[in-house]
Amino acid sequence: MRVIFLALLIARKEGKGDENTIIKMALAHDLPETRTADLAYVHKVYSQTDDMRAARDLFAGTSFRDFENIHSRYEKRDCVEAKIVKDADNLDIDLELKELEEQGHKLPAKWKAMRKFVRDKKLYTKTAKSLWDKLQKANVAQWHMEANKWKKIPSAGR
């Protein structure tokens, strides 16, 4: 769900893309992985999946046949909507890593250089790069601490 909102944010900040297509693409972008698995980077070096076939099989004979084409466009990155959704998908990974880092996990530190490479070489939009930069300095739990009902409602929890 977060990918959808990130994609819409990027599209609106960039002033580009059809929002209807972006929403559908963001909904469908990972669905074939329910059949092929979400392979980690190292697994992709040694394994191949056929996400296009998985999408075709997944949507065939359903009311969502149009999603096969939407997924195909996403995989090809041949339109601005696909690039926006891919940027959102990458930012979602970075948000998850930031959340893990703030929980004390060590994995995010190990991925820092690789994710910086993704920021510099793989993100398509200026907005996504700007959001990535801001995320590195952000406290992802700050909203929760500031909106905490214990602060706003003095009698809460008594």
Predicted regions and their residues:
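Alpha-helical, largely C-terminal catalytic domains
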Residues: 1-158
